[in-house]
Amino acid sequence: ACGSCRKKCKGPGKCINGRCKCY
């Protein structure tokens, strides 16, 4: 469960294998 990656990254992000990857 990533939750909201956009909020965690404070920008664009993607959920991969249950983790947020930020761009």
UniProtKB/Swiss-Prot annotation:
UniProt key word Protein transport: no
GO cellular component, one term: extracellular region
Marked site: Basic residue of the functional dyad: 14
Expression (tissue specificity): Expressed by the venom gland.
InterPro entries: Scorpion_toxin-like_sf
Principal place of residence: secreted
GO molecular function annotations of the record: potassium channel regulator activity; toxin activity
Subcellular location: Secreted
Keywords in alphabetical order: Amidation, Disulfide bond, Ion channel impairing toxin, Neurotoxin, Potassium channel impairing toxin, Secreted, Toxin
Aromatic residue of the functional dyad (site feature) positions: 23
Coiled-coil ranges per UniProt: none
Renumbered residue ranges of the record's region Interaction with Ca(2+)-activated K(+) channels: 13-20
Keyword Disulfide bond among UniProt keywords: yes
Modified residues (Tyrosine amide): 23
Paired cysteines (S-S): 2-15, 5-20, 9-22
Functional note: Reversibly blocks Shaker B potassium channels, with a dissociation constant of 200 nM.
Entry text on domains: Has the structural arrangement of an alpha-helix connected to antiparallel beta-sheets by disulfide bonds (CS-alpha/beta).
The family this protein is said to belong to: Belongs to the short scorpion toxin superfamily. Potassium channel inhibitor family. Alpha-KTx 13 subfamily.
Protein name: Potassium channel toxin alpha-KTx 13.3
Organism listed in the record: Tityus pachyurus (Colombian scorpion)
High-level lineage: Eukaryota, Metazoa, Ecdysozoa, Arthropoda, Chelicerata
